[in-house]
Amino acid sequence: HDIGKVSPLFQQQLKHGYLRAPNFVFRHEIASLFFLSLLKEEEKDAVIEMIVAHHKSVYEDVSNKGFLDLDENRDSFGIHIKDFSTWSADALGILAGLGLETHPISIEEAHENYEYAIDYCWSLEDGWSEWKGMLMAADHYASALNEKTEVNLDNLFVKPDLSFYNRQHELYPLSTIPTDDTRKHTMVTAPTGAGKTDFLLRRCRGRVFYTLPFQASINAMYDRIKDNLKNTKAQVYLLHASSELKVEDGVLEERILQRHIGASVKVLTPHQMASIVYGIKGYEAMAADLQGCDVILDEIHTYSGEIQSIVLRIIEILLALDCRVHVGTATMPSVLYHQILTLLGGQEQVYEVKLPDETLRDFNRHIIYKIDDWEKSKEVIDDAIEKGNKILLVCNQVKRSQNLYSQLSDLYPSLKKMLIHSRFK
């Protein structure tokens, strides 16, 4: 896809002090198309999709530099073929060194290849190209890992062994409900602590994308799944804006791999999948990564109205990518629930799971004691300190939390304490 960079017109752009002439456009991808006839006939169309748009859209590109734009508006072939009879020999030598069977290509043959690509691109319907997504993903992956690329390929698409989550316990009522229903998608409604995570993971059949709404919650889920699957071959990655910092103690490859295609389980927020909704740069690689996978949308009820709209659109696209979608929630407005159920294909396609009323009545996880005043809480704090327990005190005003922190600092000067509130920046 980059062999067109051999052209002197590209090479001169790399020289110090080079100034490009106004309106001059040379796209190395177009020059790469001159070598199409080296491929088998059945490979050509896929390779065109990989090459022709891996930097710019094929048609009506925002900069008007798409492959078809340039062909319509200027002598694109004439520009890119310059000195081809000279530089093509070097290009063929590189391709031969990479194992491709080559033969000399005349300017006439290069023109035939160019016109074949033009005709093919005009024949395409609107939509995304999985071949472009694969090329972009592979290109970025290899560029990031360099000589360590091959050693990491064996684990790139390992299907996770999720048998760990077959565990059962009476405290977790969802753990006793079977997950072998043949319907493709899942909607689970159950209280926090009922075993939704295990249930959703047991419903998965392939690689998993596990989404949660908040960075802190996906950090915790990443740690949990990584620990649960530590004795398997599963590759578990974390994807959010600060995820590289989260695994700063890991090896360099792990930090690099987070950003690229592959992994048995990826833990992320829906924002990381938003590129497939907006069609922003690189969305094809994300779509190629998601295609045919299991996607868990957990705690979906916590999103704002705007994010819920994006999530609904994400679900539509996931279905188009043949994903299995599993939704988990503690509570959800009935309108949103039925909207998602309809999107997923209704009861014929969705395994709906809700705990029976008698289970919910007995579902007591905690005992809450009401303290009449602050003075009585000191006994509770003293008892917790003596037992070595951690203590969380929650106030509904920043000023109140600051005053309480000062009091605790005076009462327990030797204990480690932390004050957290929204005015910290």
Language-model region placement:
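N-terminal helicase ATP-binding lobe
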Residues: 2-425
